[in-house]
Amino acid sequence: MDFTNFDDFAFAYYGLPVRASLVSLVDHTHTFQSPTALPQHQAISGLAHSGLPFGTLPTGNRNQSMEGSKAHPDRTSPASEAPEDPTTDEFGLASRSRAGGIDPGGKPKEDKADATPAWSELKTKAGKERKRLPLACVACRRKKSRCSGEKPACEHCLRSYIPCVYKVTTRKAAPRTNCMAMLDKRPKRMEERVIEAISKSDQEVASSVTRPVVKPAIPGTVPSSQPTKKRGAEEAFGPDLEAWAKAPSEPKTEGDDGSSSLQVQEGEENKLQHEGTDALPSKEIQEHLAEVFFDNIYGQSYHLLHKPSYMRKLKNGTLPPVLVLTVCAVAARFTSSPLVSSSGPEFLRGEEWASHARDICTRRYEWPNLTILTCLLILGLHEFGTCQGGRSWALGGQAIRMAFALQLHKDLEYDPLDRNGTKTQLSFIDREIRRRIMWACFLMDRFNSSGTDRPMFVREDTIQIPLPVKEKYFQFGLPAPTEMLDGRVPHPPSPNDGQIADVRENMGVAAFLIRAITLWGRITTYLSQGCKDLDPNPLWEDESHHMKHLNDAVNLEASLPLSLKYSAENLEVHKTENTPSQFLFMHICLQHNILLVSRAAMSARKQHGVHDDFFFEASKRTFNAANRISELLREAEQSGCFVSAPFAGYCAFSSATVHSVGIISRNPSMKLAAQANLTTNVKYLHKMKKYWGMFHWMVENVRTQYQNVLDAMRAGANVEERATQLSFLQYGDWFNRYPRGLSHAEFMDPATHKRKDSGADGVLEANPELRSVEEYFTLPTPQRVENKDTISAAAPKRKQNAKKQTDMPAQSDRNLDWLQSTDADAVSQERKLSGGLGLQITGSAGFNPLTASNQQSPDFSTTMLPMSPVNMTSFAHHAHTPTFFPPQPFAMNFGQGSNGNIDPLDRQFIYGGYSMDASTSLGDGHTWAL
């Protein structure tokens, strides 16, 4: 019988057939293997309800049953998804006919009930035996029942007479969650970023490192032929990195942050060449004030700007307007030109120009450059003179930060902020300008931080640059090596370069002035910032900080080169170099250091264990240094050199406080010397207060101290209990006095306030116009009427002398110099003082304790004793110097205590701290007679 003709057939049955026929049917089906005999289990359900025998099912009915089985979407026939091989299923096993293991009734044959499932022959991907069914049919999955897994129909489907469908899809199984894929990709992306960021030198090390396998592949998603080990970093990323490294650099776009910031900075720097032009004065005033700046300011406070370069650029019009405005603002106070003069005080003349320059500088704090830094330093000095303590303090701090941002504290050969990348070597003048700007910041920090509660910011060991060279070397551009602040020589000269072997000869006034101010900063830190209390050793011991500072001050003056030691010849040499004021200012600072250290030791007399010799030496050094400062100020006045540095005024103030004690001495030589020196200091302070506003306060402080001296002499109180309470007025304390400027009433001279009489008081008694000496000192700002006719008739010689002594107008002298008061005031003061206090006046002329006319003591030069009891120079050549007091100003009987002591002066000086036994000799035949 040819079975090839039966391509498709189905069987129908009524009930269970006999076992013999069923066995024969099974044998028959086993022998029948048609190539097209794929199981068509959809037709079985239709056969169960039809009454047709096997082999009689029409073809049309079969097709209808097949179409009906596809009505439900979940009951599609697997015939369309069957493999191409009709004899194998999707697991690679040969399909068996429906009668192979299960009878038509749905019950398996008893002899094959324990047969091994067909899917057990499959192996897992790892090559192990499969123990679980790989895929269940759709019906078993819906009913949550165990599927036997036979093909073409499982036991459950045969038993239930339902189609058995194994749903096989071509879509790969997705991971349980998307987070697994995300975690797998994240390390790869991080690895790519790291490889892009590493440098070329580190790629060789990374090439030998194998990239880790973060997560194994999901079963069924990776072909078996792909290796499980990943490639190395060099193999995976080597070609890409090589191409990236050799690729040409891309041009920067306009939106790049770095390039945009650079363009903004360049634009701001370009604006400096024209911003502020509208506020500039005329060209004539610019050149005039530039000369005034270099004559009165340059070198005395800071060594800023190179004069030849500045003047050349000024004439060519290539200077930034902000720099010109700054120079004009600070120099306007010293000019006498009618084009610059104003109705206000001299120290406020340049405020209009300073305000424009200040606005320009404060808007550019983000972009540091040397021009803005120089302007900040000069503006800080100007605000110092206008008593704007807050502004000066802030501008100084901003300048210091900007200097460190520009790396001026390092001695570099190239500009570190050069944006061109060319690294052009700096010239000697440019390097010296950078050094001097940094030293100016250092000095400003010392000046501004000298107060009690103002610590210093810049440490000495931070400045790693040489000290400035001599001024003539700087002006002519002659390079020369110098020492650093600690004495080291960074660039020692070689024998064959033609330079001076001794580097100290290359150091001028600027270098030793910096060292003097540095030592002064250490002393103020020791005295006013708590270091004195932390010293474990007493002041008089050699290991104490006090003795160390004293030795440093003395040795610094002794270590000056011969060309810088004070002498008349060296002063003339410095006049030829246009640096006499700088030379005098340096020596004033050196003497002030000795005065400051020695004065602090005088308060330790009553301490336990102090020796009289220690106190005697400290007192001698204090008075000698104070007298020496007055001598230098007098030499400057006679030589026509004006020492305009504000710190020089503070040195004169400190010296004046010592002289105020010497005035009441019972030693005639000390008394006369103190009178002459105090006159010099007070005149100098009155001249300085026209240019620097804070000296109004210092002059009033000297006046108060003198009044305390008079009160102490009258009362005769015991001062030994307050001998250790000596405190000092520091240079930086004016910040607290004038944090935001001073009012008009604080700097206006009393002579400018004219008293106005109302018309209703015309018939009343006239108000008195004169005051006594006691009233003058009691009232810091006395009022008086200024009558031009009376003044001209009473004191014509005073006005003539005033014109000879100063270049300022006579009216300004009368308004600002209380030393030159009228003779009418002096007569009234004489009458009041002699009547109230019993003062015995010698001579016919009236006496004013604030000034003495040249005719008052014609024989003063012949009766003048040496200035100091310790080898002081005679004042025979100062015969016409007006004295602060007459030869015998205190020939009166003051009450004293039983112990002969006097009550305290003020918080600055304690008179008892200077008292000593009258028999104590000073070493030159003179004795103390306080």
Curated annotation (Swiss-Prot):
GO terms for cellular component: nucleus. SUPFAM superfamilies: Zn2/Cys6 DNA-binding domain (SSF57701). It is found in: Nucleus. GO terms for molecular function: DNA binding; DNA-binding transcription factor activity, RNA polymerase II-specific; zinc ion binding. It comes from the Eukaryota. Induction: Exclusively expressed during infection of common bean. Keywords: Metal-binding, Nucleus, Transcription, Transcription regulation, Virulence. Transmembrane segments: none annotated. Multiple copies of the gene are present in highly virulent fusarium oxysporum strains. This is Zn(2)-C6 fungal-type transcription factor FTF1c. The lineage of its organism: Eukaryota, Fungi, Dikarya, Ascomycota, Pezizomycotina.
